[in-house]
Design a protein with these regions (language model features):
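Bacterial Sec-dependent signal peptides at the C-terminal "C-region" and cleavage site
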Residues: 18-30
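Beta-rich carbohydrate-recognition and catalytic domains
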Residues: 27-119, 123-189, 197-251, 259-310, ...
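N-terminal secretory signal peptides and thylakoid transit peptides that target proteins
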Residues: 2-17
Length: 350
């Protein structure tokens, strides 16, 4: 396992120790209160198994929640000390979750996924006020993953690729479609969590990426395709850049969850400031390329003793029975003894 100060998780911890002040944000787009979820559940709804040989023995992370065949499902990324793999859980009520098993395992014979494969999104209904029903593409479900080349915690520059399934349990892994070395300086250090949105025949692949160096920065950009083969990075990337000195997202503007609300594109993302606070923020735009950051925190870290006292980050959002549900990775404690699992906040009281 790598020294924490050179891992993403370790970098967050190092920033937390720094304890610097941060400044305010910019102007808030109108009517963003409809995206707020101030009522935290306050407990983990999914956590590590703690079984030594299990794929999710140490942590669960990066929720992606959707609806299919009358039930809710969540993909999640697990870590077992070697690398990331992808699990699936199911629920009837968005609170009580049953693990269904590992659906994407590392493949020792693959140069891409021999140590890691983290699927973060499956093409779903884009609408904000929806349960996130899955949509088939060419008769199958279409997911998107990222994978790091080495064993350990996010070791080496990750790539992004597509994957296909007929039943959600068995996946065909395609070669990477985005590589860090093909991009600009803001993404040369490696690619992170992807989000794939189909809109009027065009596929928009949102992702965050990092610069090179031990104290890198993370920002969010987008690449688009009409055929799922040729991808063109937006020339104005990063579309969600780091904020100015002292802002909430001075270090990281990461892990996009992008939905459509009428004529609006709504970007949920997580931030890291120089004080080491990781929390979920919001940006809103009229197209996939020009989000304006909102001057408010959607999900903040909790008080000492809470499940998210260290970090509250990595959003996944669905709508159910008149309420917006905002799932996120909740972290308490300090690396390497932190507790990392999935929690949820919603727009009305529990």
């Amino acid at each position: 396992m790598p020294c924490p100060r050179f891992s993403r998780r370790g970098l967050l911890a190092a920033s937390l120790i720094a304890g610097l002040e941060h400044a305010g944000f910019g102007q808030t787009p109108a009517d963003t209160a409809r995206y707020e979820t101030p009522y935290k559940y306050g407990r983990l709804v999914l956590e590590a198994s703690k079984e030594p040989e299990a794929f999710d023995s140490r942590t669960v992370d990066c929720p992606f929640v959707f609806h299919h065949d009358g039930r809710f499902y969540m993909t999640y990324v697990s870590w077992d000390g070697t690398g990331y793999q992808t699990g699936l859980a199911s629920s009837n009520n968005l609170v009580d979750w049953k693990k269904e098993g590992c659906i994407l395992r590392r493949d020792p014979s693959s140069p891409v996924t021999r140590y890691n494969i983290a699927m973060n999104w499956i093409v779903r209904a884009n609408e904000m006020r929806s349960a996130g029903e899955l949509k088939k593409v060419r008769g199958r479900f279409l997911g998107v993953y990222h994978a790091y080349p080495n064993a350990g915690l996010e070791e080496g520059p990750a790539v992004i690729g597509l994957c296909w399934s007929s039943d959600l349990m068995h996946w065909e892994i395609a070669d990477p479609c985005l590589r860090p070395e093909d991009g600009a300086a803001w993404e040369n250090g490696g690619l992170y969590k992807p989000c794939l949105v189909e809109h009027r025949g065009t596929y928009h692949l949102f992702y965050n990426a990092k610069t090179k160096g031990a104290r890198w920065r993370e920002q969010t950009g987008v690449a688009s395709s009409n055929d799922l083969k040729s991808w063109k990075r937006y020339e104005g990337n990063p579309t969600i850049p780091n904020g100015p000195a002292g802002s909430w997202d001075e270090r990281f503007a990461s892990d996009p969850c992008v939905l459509v609300d009428g004529s609006r594109w709504v970007f949920f993302y997580y931030s890291l400031d120089t004080a080491g606070k990781a929390r979920d923020l919001l940006a809103v735009g009229t197209d996939p390329f020009h989000p304006a950051k909102a001057a408010r925190i959607l999900v903040d870290v909790g008080p000492p003793g809470s499940v998210d006292s260290t970090y509250a980050h990595k959003p996944s959002v669905v709508y159910h029975e008149g309420a917006l549900y905002h799932f996120y990775c909740a972290v308490s404690g300090k690396w390497p003894k932190e507790v990392r699992g999935i929690s949820v906040a919603r727009s009305r009281p529990w």
